[in-house]
């Protein structure tokens, strides 16, 4: 198969300083605000503004360091975050294809995918860089990871609209952080965390609800089927199988011995079973 290149939408612009998206002059909404409004309206409650600002500033700094490495091979030797990012890329075989790749639904929404990694001629994976406090794999941070899942799912949905001939293999969070805590210890995290994509229908419904000014309700996930195994029955059948095979082996050995003594090469039982020596 011939390699399929990424499509870049003519007229789609991202003004990074103001974090605004435009398509041929029409302003589009980013998905981050939609996710907050529709699904996690209280996620920032009680967090002082100066902490939010400091977190955003740190995140922007790390994003830029990683982007400069991926796009320009500019290496910041003092950045532990870059060292950890490069280690993750080596461990998981990530092949950088694009950073801050713009996607859109061509009507109301747009976003910039942090990372797009090439998997094959027609397949990519999409990664999102997170520098937030707290291990995202821990139960206490389940909501943070679910927010990432929704964000990546919307990226995937719009990526496929922009690139209808391509496929998306995996969605994952690259959680990279190295900050000094108040007690002087180092809060260092370097993890790749896979997330399961939401169905395309759910992504469309979420964005449609936002356009209509309606409140979106996330469909309940189907309960996971539990695997049940009757271990005692399996053990009994395996034991029976072993005993039967042992008896058959003894019968076969005796028959072959008797046939050899009688000079017979073929024997057919009264019920039609044919035995050949």
Question: Predicted regions: what is each one?
Answer:
Residues 1-112:
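Metal-dependent nuclease catalytic cores that hydrolyze phosphodiester bonds in DNA/RNA
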Residues 14-18, 168-171, 259-264:
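A short, compositionally biased
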Residues 48-56, 141-149, 234, 238-241, ...:
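Short, charged/polar micro-motifs that form catalytic or ligand-binding hotspots
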Residues 62-63, 155, 237:
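A residue-level signal for conserved active-site and pocket-lining positions in enzyme catalytic cores
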Residues 70, 157-164, 242, 256:
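Hydrophobic/aromatic-lined pockets within catalytic cores
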Residues 84-91, 242-277:
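Extended, charge-rich alpha-helical segments
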Residues 97-208:
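Mg2+/Mn2+-dependent nuclease catalytic core
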Residues 200-253:
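Short, charged, low-complexity amphipathic alpha-helix
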